[in-house]
Curated annotation (Swiss-Prot):
Species of provenance: Danio rerio
Stated family: Belongs to the protein kinase superfamily. Ser/Thr protein kinase family.
Any one of the GO CC terms: cytoplasm
Its biological purpose: May act as a positive regulator of ERK phosphorylation downstream of fibroblast growth factor-receptor activation. May induce both caspase-dependent apoptosis and caspase-independent cell death. Plays a role in the embryonic development.
The entry's keywords: ATP-binding, Cell junction, Cell membrane, Cytoplasm, Developmental protein, Kinase, Membrane, Nucleotide-binding, Serine/threonine-protein kinase, Transferase, Tyrosine-protein kinase
Name this polypeptide is given: Dual serine/threonine and tyrosine protein kinase
Annotated compartments: Cytoplasm; Cell membrane; Apical cell membrane; Basolateral cell membrane
Molecular function terms from GO: ATP binding; protein serine kinase activity; protein serine/threonine kinase activity; protein serine/threonine/tyrosine kinase activity; protein tyrosine kinase activity
Biological process (GO), any one: notochord cell vacuolation
Length: 885
C-alpha cells in the first residue's frame, strides 16, 4: 500500500477547489439575479440614460455562459497511458491501495504486444459502501451479474474489468462504476480510459468535454512513445486544452528519449521542467505547461502542485472575469450618479436662466420701441431725403407689369391708371421698407448676439434632456419658432411678414388720398409726378408711431407665448427630474452598494486563490470598525499591515465594499497608503462571523505617535505639505476623505506622510448626507448633511493646528466639552481651537482660513499648498524643501 499522506494532500487541494467553487457559484448566481432585476425593474426609469451606457449595465451573454460552465464543472482525474497495466498501476498509487490487478492477475498484456485489449472504461466514485456496477455513460445502471457480487474481494476481479464475448452492444459500451469509501473520492471522481481498440480516443474524450474540469494524467511504462501514442496525445490536446502530467510507472532506464519526444510536441517545457517544489513551469504567455514525473516515488511532489495550479488557473480566470464585469458596471453606476446629480442641479438653473434672459430681452426690445419713436421719425425723414432723387428716377423708369400700353402712352382704361399708381406706390414703399428696416435691425443687433443665441442653446439643452416626451419636443420647437418670429427682427421685416403688411398697408392708405381729376397721359413726367406726390404725402411721425406700435404688439404677444411654452416645458422637466432623483437614490442606496459587495467578494476570491490567506501577526492598533495586525508578507510584499473588519450588518458591508472599490480604483500615489488586496475569512472567530481582511502597506507609525515622540518644525511642515498633496489627489479623483485626523496620517521612517483609512471616502455624487468623521475634525456643515470637499479643508485646518503646536494635547476649547453632543453644539456655534504663543502669524491665518464656518470662504488646496511652501522656506530656510524632497 502506498503512503496515505499522498491522497490526503491531493484531497486537500480538491477540497479547496470545491470550497472556493461554492463561493464562486454563489457570487455568480447573485450577479445574474442582480442584472436580471436591473433589466426588468429599471428599463423604463433608465430610459434617460444613454443607450450605450444602459447596454453596458448588463451581463455579456458569452461571459455568462463561460462562467456558468466553469462553476458547473466537476473536477475529474482522467487517467490515460501507454497500456492498461500502466494505468492500473498509477490508479493504485493514487488511491494508496492495490485496488486493480497487476502482473499475471491482470491477464495478458494489451496493445501491440498482447493483441486486442478487452478492458472496459472505469469510473471511481464515492459511496458509503464498496460496490461495483455496469452503467451506460451518463445514463442508467445495467442489471448485470458481476463476479464481484459473488463474494468478498480486495482487488477488482479481472473478469469484471473485461468485456465478455457474449455481451450485447449496450453492455460492451458500458463503463464499470466502482464505488468506494475513500477521502479523495469525496472531492473528485476518477476515470480510467480504455485502450484505443476498445473505444476510440475521440469517442472516449467526448464524454469528458461536458461539465467536467479534467486533471489529465498519462502513465508511461516504456522508454518512448509510439507514433500512434503521439497521435493520440495530439488528439488529446486538441480535444481538451489542459496540461498533462506524464508519470513514469516503471523503474528502469533514463527518460531522455521520452523527454525529447514530449518537449518536441510542446507537451512539456523544453527547459529544466519543474521547479524544486515540483510545481509546473508556465509559458511566457502565461499558459500552463505539462510536467514529467520521472517516478512514482515523486508523484506526491509533482502531482499536488500540478493539480493545484490547474484548478487555481481555472478559478482565477473566472473570478478575474467576474470581478472585471463588476468593476466596469460599478464604475458606470458611479458615472451615471454624477450625471444624474448634475442633471438635478443644472436643469432648474437652465429653466430659471431661460426665463430671466427672455425677460431681459423683452424689456430691452420694449425699451427700444418706447424710446426710439422720435429717433425713428428722424431716421425716416433722413432716409426719404437721401433716397428721394433715386426714388424719383426709379419711378420715372419703371416698367409697368400686366398693363398693355398704347404707343402714345394713353391708358386703355381708368382701372389701368389705378394699377399704375399702385405699382409706383409699391416701389416707393418697398424701397423705404428696406432702408428703414436695415437701420432698425442694426439698433438691436447686439441683442440678437447676446440674448437669442444663448437662449436657443439653453432651450436646445432642455429639449435634449427630455427625448422620451414628444409633447416636450413640440413645445420646445414652438418656443424656438416664437423666438425666431419675435426677435429676429431682420428676418421678420425682410420676409414681408404680417407686421410689415399691417403697418405698410396704412402707408398705402395715406398715399391713396392723392386724387386725380382727369386721367393723365402715362409718361415719364407723369410717373415722376405721382412718385413726388406720394413721397411728399408720407408722414414720418405717423410711420414711426405705426412701426413702434406694431413692434410692441408683436413683442407682447411673443412674450406671453414664450412664458406659456416655458411653463409647459418646466412641467415636463419636473416629472422627469422626479424620476431621475428616484433612480439616483436607487443607484446610491441599492444598485452600487450591492454590486460593490459582489465585486469585493469576487476580488477577494481571486486574491486568496493567487496568494493564499495572510497570517496575522501582533496587534498594531484598534479603530472604531476593526483591528490592525502586523503581517510579515503576502503576495510577495513585506512587511504588510492587515486590517480586520467584521461588518455587523448589510449597511457596513456595503460601505466597506464601496470603500474597497474606490481605494482599489485609485492610481498609485506616493501620498496614499497602498492597498495590496483583500481576503474574506469565513472561519473568523471559529466560523461564527465573517471578516474582511484588507492587506495594505506597512508604515513606521501614525502622526499621533510621531507628535508624541517629537518632530522638528521642518518635519511637521513637510508632513502638512504631504497631507495637502494627498487630499488634493483624492479631490482630483472626485473623492472626499471625510475623516482627516492624526490617526489616519501614517509616517514612514523618514517621517514622510501618507493618508490611510479611506473608510468614509466617497465620490460627491454617491454621498447620502450621512454624518461621519471624528467630532473634533468635523466641519459644521457635516451636521446638516449638505457638504462638499471643503470639509477636508476644514479637517486639515484642525490637523495643522496640532502640527503647529507640536503636541497631541486637545485644544482648550474642545477639552472643556463634557460630551460629544456638547462639542458638536459648540462647533456649530463657531467654537474653534485657540491660538498658542508658539504659532507663527502666517500659520495662524492659514488655519483660521481653513476652518472658516462658511465653506465658500475656505481656501482651495491649490492655494494652501504654495502658502505652506512659502511658510516652510521662510521658517526653515530656502533650500530645506528641496533637500527634503
Amino acid at each position: 500500500m502506498e503512503n496515505p499522506q499522498k491522497p490526503r494532500e491531493l484531497t486537500r487541494a480538491f477540497n479547496h477547489y470545491n470550497k472556493h467553487s461554492g463561493f464562486l457559484k454563489k457570487n455568480l448566481k447573485e450577479t445574474i439575479l442582480f442584472f436580471r432585476e436591473i433589466r426588468q425593474n429599471h428599463s423604463n426609469t433608465c430610459a434617460a440614460a444613454e443607450p450605450g451606457q444602459l447596454s453596458c449595465i448588463s451581463f455579456p451573454r458569452q461571459d455568462e455562459e463561460y462562467l456558468q460552465n466553469v462553476v458547473s464543472s466537476a473536477p475529474y482525474i482522467l487517467i490515460l497511458g501507454q497500456d492498461c497495466s500502466a494505468r492500473y498501476q498509477l490508479l493504485n498509487c493514487l488511491l494508496g491501495e492495490r485496488l486493480l490487478p497487476l502482473g499475471p492477475e491482470a491477464g495478458g498484456a494489451c496493445g501491440a504486444e498482447g493483441g486486442a485489449c478487452r478492458r472496459r472504461k472505469l469510473c471511481f466514485t464515492h459511496g458509503r459502501q464498496t460496490r461495483l456496477s455496469l452503467a451506460l455513460p451518463g445514463q442508467y445502471e445495467l442489471v448485470h451479474q458481476l463476479a464481484a457480487h459473488c463474494g468478498r474481494w480486495d482487488t477488482v476481479p479481472r473478469q469484471d474489468l473485461e468485456i465478455q464475448e457474449c455481451e450485447d452492444p449496450a453492455q460492451r459500451l458500458a463503463e464499470l462504476e466502482i464505488t468506494l469509501h475513500h477521502t479523495l473520492l469525496q472531492e473528485v471522481k476518477i476515470m480510467v480510459l480504455p485502450c484505443r481498440n476498445v473505444q476510440p480516443l475521440e469517442e472516449a474524450l467526448e464524454d469528458c468535454k461536458r461539465g467536467i474540469l479534467p486533471i489529465v494524467l498519462y502513465a508511461v511504462s516504456r522508454e518512448s512513445l509510439s507514433a500512434q501514442q503521439l497521435e493520440d496525445l495530439q488528439t488529446l490536446r486538441e480535444s481538451l486544452p489542459f496540461p498533462v502530467c506524464f508519470i513514469r510507472v516503471s523503474d528502469g532506464g533514463g527518460g531522455g528519449a521520452l523527454f525529447t519526444q514530449l518537449a518536441s510536441l510542446q507537451l512539456i517545457s523544453a527547459s529544466a521542467g519543474n521547479c524544486a517544489c515540483g510545481a509546473p513551469a508556465a509559458q511566457s504567455a502565461g499558459r500552463m505547461q505539462g510536467v514529467l514525473c520521472d517516478s512514482l516515488e515523486r508523484l506526491q511532489r509533482v502531482l499536488v502542485p500540478f493539480t493545484r495550479q490547474v484548478l487555481q488557473n481555472q478559478q482565477v480566470e473566472a473570478a478575474t472575469l467576474l470581478n472585471t464585469i463588476h468593476c466596469r458596471c460599478l464604475d458606470l453606476f458611479i458615472i451615471q450618479a454624477f450625471d444624474m446629480q448634475r442633471d438635478l442641479q443644472i436643469t432648474p438653473r437652465r429653466l430659471e436662466y431661460t426665463r430671466e434672459k427672455e425677460g431681459e430681452l423683452f424689456c430691452s426690445l420694449m425699451a427700444i420701441a418706447n424710446r426710439k419713436q422720435e429717433e425713428m421719425k428722424e431716421m425716416i425723414v433722413e432716409t426719404l431725403s437721401s433716397m428721394k432723387e433715386q426714388l424719383l428716377e426709379d419711378a420715372q423708369n419703371l416698367d409697368f407689369t400686366d398693363i398693355i400700353m398704347s404707343s402714345n402712352g394713353e391708358p386703355v382704361s381708368s382701372k389701368d391708371i389705378k394699377v399704375c399708381i399702385s405699382q409706383i406706390q409699391d416701389l416707393i414703399v418697398n424701397r423705404l421698407n428696406q432702408a428703414v428696416a436695415n437701420k432698425l435691425t442694426n439698433s438691436v443687433d447686439y441683442l440678437r448676439e447676446s440674448f437669442v443665441g444663448t437662449l436657443e442653446r439653453c432651450l436646445g439643452s432642455l429639449e435634449k434632456s427630455t427625448p422620451e416626451s414628444c409633447a416636450h419636443n413640440v413645445t420646445s420647437n414652438h418656443l424656438k419658432q416664437i423666438l425666431n418670429a419675435a426677435y429676429h427682427v431682420e428676418v421678420t421685416f425682410h420676409s414681408g411678414s404680417s407686421v410689415t403688411r399691417l403697418f405698410w398697408e396704412q402707408i398705402k392708405q395715406i398715399i391713396h388720398r392723392i386724387t386725380w381729376v382727369n386721367p393723365p397721359a402715362i409718361t415719364a413726367e407723369w410717373k415722376r409726378k405721382v412718385a413726388q406726390d406720394a413721397i411728399e404725402s408720407l408722414s414720418a411721425a405717423k410711420l414711426a408711431k405705426s412701426i413702434c406700435s406694431q413692434f410692441r404688439t408683436r413683442l407682447n404677444s411673443s412674450h406671453e407665448a414664450f412664458a406659456a411654452s416655458l411653463r409647459q416645458l418646466e412641467e415636463g422637466h419636473t416629472g422627469r427630474l422626479e424620476r431621475t432623483e428616484d433612480l439616483w437614490l436607487r443607484v446610491r442606496k441599492d444598485h452600487a452598494p450591492r454590486l460593490a459587495r459582489l465585486s469585493l467578494e469576487s476580488r477577494s476570491l481571486r486574491d486568496i486563490l493567487l496568494h493564499g490567506k495572510p497570517k496575522l501577526g501582533r496587534e498594531l492598533g484598534r479603530g472604531q470598525y476593526g483591528v490592525v495586525y502586523l503581517c510579515d508578507s503576502w503576495a510577495g510584499r513585506h512587511p504588510c499591515a492587515l486590517k480586520s473588519v467584521v461588518p455587523p450588518d448589510d449597511k457596513h458591508w456595503n460601505d466597506l465594499a464601496l470603500e474597497f472599490h474606490y481605494t482599489r480604483s485609485l492610481p498609485k500615489h506616493e501620498r496614499l497608503v497602498n492597498l495590496h488586496g483583500s481576503v474574506i475569512d469565513h472561519s473568523y472567530s471559529g466560523g461564527s462571523s465573517i471578516a474582511v481582511l484588507l492587506i495594505m502597506e506597512r508604515l513606521h507609525r501614525d502622526l499621533y505617535t510621531g507628535l508624541k515622540a517629537g518632530l522638528s518644525l521642518k518635519e511637521r511642515l513637510l508632513i502638512a505639505l504631504d497631507v495637502v498633496e494627498g487630499i488634493r489627489f483624492l479631490h482630483s479623483q472626485g473623492l472626499l476623505h471625510r475623516d482627516i485626523k492624526l490617526k489616519n496620517v501614517l509616517l514612514d521612517k523618514q517621517n514622510r506622510a501618507k493618508i490611510t483609512d479611506l473608510g468614509f471616502c466617497k465620490p460627491e455624487a454617491m454621498m447620502s448626507g450621512s454624518i461621519v468623521g471624528t467630532p473634533i475634525h468635523m466641519a459644521p456643515e457635516l451636521f446638516t448633511g449638505k457638504y462638499d470637499n471643503s470639509v477636508d479643508v476644514y479637517a486639515f485646518g484642525i490637523l495643522f493646528w496640532y502640527l503647529c503646536s507640536g503636541s497631541v494635547k486637545l485644544p482648550e476649547a474642545f477639552e472643556k466639552c463634557a460630551s460629544k453632543d456638547q462639542l458638536w453644539t459648540n462647533v456649530k456655534k463657531g467654537c474653534r481651537p485657540e491660538r498658542l504663543p508658539v504659532f507663527d502669524e502666517e500659520c495662524w491665518q492659514l488655519m483660521e482660513a481653513c476652518w472658516n464656518g462658511d465653506p465658500s470662504q475656505r481656501p482651495l488646496l491649490g492655494i494652501v499648498q504654495p502658502g505652506l511652501q512659502s511658510i516652510m522656506e521662510r521658517l526653515c530656510g530656502e533650500k530645506s524643501l528641496e533637500d527634503s524632497n
